[in-house]
Amino acid sequence: MTKPGSPPERKPKPSLRVRVAVVAASVLFALLVFEIFLRVTDFSYPTFYRPDPVLGYTLEPGAEGWQTKEGRAYVRVNSDGLRDREREKRKAADVLRVALLGDSYAEAVQVALEDAFHAVLERRLGQCPAAAGRRVEVINFGVSGYSTAQELLTLRERVRAYEPDVVLLLVTTNNDVTDNVRAFKDADDIPYLVLRGDGLAPDNSFRDGLKFRFRTSSLARAGRWLYANLRFTHAFQKARHVFKARLAQRRERRLLREAEERREAAARAAGGTQAPANGATPQPEPQAGVARGDLANMVYLEPADEGWRGAWRLMERLLVEMRGEVEARGARFFVATGSNPIQVFPDPAARAAFLARLGPGADLFGPERRFAEMGQRNGLVVFSLAPELQAYADERKVFLHGWPGDLGNGHWNENGHRAAGELLAQKMCERLAPQGGAAPEGGTR
């Protein structure tokens, strides 16, 4: 008890341990409330991948959740790590089985599984006379971001066990050629196959890299467990990705602005003028096109240097190797080139403006021509989808890529998957017909 007039006694401060405990309890309570809120609102931002010592990464068996980065679809990975329904590895006698290899277009997490082109293909091929009453299965081995080299490794590691009658490779022309080359892909956490003389040599140096070693560590495994079981980690990851995407968009706008300024400066230096009064699109100099520096768009130009020529040679060798391994097991091998957004943008004027920015020699179907030439040289069956998909989009005035707010960009939407699946089924049905009625091997359709 204090004496009258004396200063009040100060209460002792809580110890540091107590203060830390209070802060920790407050944080945990806030996270608990946040977790409950996210679960009640059914928020999720799932990750579907895990590291793999052969392929770099694969889909995580059993992973599932809503994918909302592009489009909206509930994605479930089956028990064998495929974005597909459950499949039996042993092939029944009455089944015609197609194994699909590809990247994000084949994985198709942007749409419901039943709307994906491979599901459309499966249904339509079932009506094909060449199926001869057999039940058709199109099994999807596609994984987002895979290079052709990773797809060849997938063929060796995973596809063979399913005993397919046909192996179908879907090529995304605006990045598959470059994804096989480390200097272009700029990724050190995946395997590569490199040309060595007339063959391919593995480059598995990614296994010794810090990034892959961390992903396979106990700490990373614990992190994946937390991510699989706690929704608030999804919210933090989404915020991180949104922040990175906005930074990338700002950088892209800055690069485009700088390229346009260089183009205008070059035009002034050459005695050029501003845009013609009639509104016609000015024709830039070859090195001044704003899109020329975009790696994905360089595929529409003739290979400009040894790096690009080497990338095309490697792609050809990978396809030949894949065909040889498939046919050695008694199956047939088909290649299909899909479509890039600008190729099927339903506005000829927009496509023409894009080509003008790229400069002289640009050809929207240049990649298809080069793949067709590969087919003719090597006896590969190549289906070129983009030209007919462009005609389809123009005739119907429909976007095959993108969703409201970003129509014409990104991956195939439901319209694109449906059109591609139906077109591919038609082309494959013709090729699967008895040999007397089929087009000769090594052609393109």
Where are the predicted features?
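N-terminal secretory targeting modules
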Residues: 1-97, 112, 161-165, 178-181, ...
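Extracytoplasmic/secreted envelope proteins and their assembly/folding machinery
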Residues: 118, 122, 152-156, 316-319, ...
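Membrane/wall-proximal cationic-aromatic binding patches
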Residues: 41-132, 252-297, 369-371, 389-407
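Conserved SGNH/GDSL esterase-like catalytic core that processes O-acyl groups on lipids
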Residues: 72-76, 88, 92-93, 97-99, ...
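Membrane-water interface at transmembrane helix exits
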Residues: 34-38, 42, 122, 425, ...
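Histidine-centered active-site loop/cap adjacent to the catalytic His
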Residues: 33, 404-445
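Generic structural signal for small/hydrophobic residues in well-ordered secondary structure
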Residues: 35, 103, 151, 167, ...
